[in-house]
Amino acid sequence: MIVSTPHGMNMFYKLWTDAKSKKNDYIPVEVHWSEVPGRDEVWKEETIRNTSQSQFNSEFECEFLGSIDTLIAPHKLKVMPYVDPIQSHADLDIFERPDPAKTYFLTADVSRGTSQDYSAFLVFDVTQMPYRVVAKYRNNEIKPLLFPQKIYEVAKAYNECFVLVEVNDIGEQVANALQFDLEYDNLVMASMRGRAGQILGAGFSGGRAQLGVRTTKSVKRVGCSNLKQLIESDKLLIPDYDIMSELSTFVVKGSSHQADDGCTDDLVACLFIFAWAVDQQYFKELTDNDIRERMYREQKDQLEQDMAPFGFIDNGIDDPEVEVDEYGTRWTTVVRDHNTDW
């Protein structure tokens, strides 16, 4: 018997959902607070007043997503399905095998390999929308010297896909190894454009080019905003449980978003780097997909209904008489006030 209070999409959440869908041998039994003698609406209001709504939802409403500060809306996270990978080996989970007719895009987040954080990458099918995660790698012990080889092998398998590496810290070493040691051709670069920030490209667009993207506050803010829109509008499909688990603990911290205390966000970092990239002109040229234009067309009718047309109000005062002569000059009548010089 396993007894637990729901708290986030952790291991117990997976055991519970698998039991409800009969994927394991556990029998799910749920006890709601209203079934306990002596607990009524008065008790509920008093408990919420002394704690918080999110804490009550988690401890007594048996909701795994008690937080309301997640980047992705909790009601969306609840209905996002996950599936088992068709193949798993050496920390690599594959959900769809490579298809020679499709286009793929890989984003990587690099750690120092000290077991505190994970080095991770995700492979996306960007042939058409909705985009899909087709492969995932995550390891908290792999060293930066070995991580480029893993990226290289998977990227080559997925049709030599485009690769975008986060280069804030040790990631620059990984990007350099891919470019110069392994001579991988499809490494995506970014150029600094002054106040415009970083622009995705192949290194020929002017400005100071770098191998990969530096996760600045601007990149993260735009990436998180785009990611929220992509997921909540079903333009990005995520079949992986680990990613959804990280999304359930990726919460507001100050003016930004980051993993909750004791949690990680390396897979989410791969997601918001991808979400930042999809709105770049270079990405649209690579994939022939304009996500902004596509979403606008789908929501055009709703947007036009929300934008009420401007009208004209008759204030009851006649406009002054205007005469236009043959030369186009406009003449108006002036009424003289005898109490002045006019």
Task: Label the predicted regions.
Residues 1-51, 174-179:
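ASCE P-loop NTPase helicase motor core
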Residues 2, 28-30, 105, 186-189, ...:
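Conserved beta-strand scaffold positions in the cores of enzyme catalytic domains, especially
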Residues 9-11, 15-18, 127-254, 309-342:
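Mg2+-dependent endonuclease catalytic cores in nucleic-acid-processing enzymes, primarily RNase H-like
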Residues 35-110:
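ATPase catalytic-site recognition across NTP-hydrolyzing enzymes
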Residues 71-100, 149-157, 285-342:
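C-terminal regions of RecA-like/P-loop NTPase motor modules
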Residues 101, 114-120, 130:
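Short, flexible loop/turn motifs enriched in small residues
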Residues 122-124:
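Conserved hydrophobic/aromatic positions in well-ordered beta-strands
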Residues 239-307:
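Charge-patterned, long linear interaction tracts outside catalytic cores
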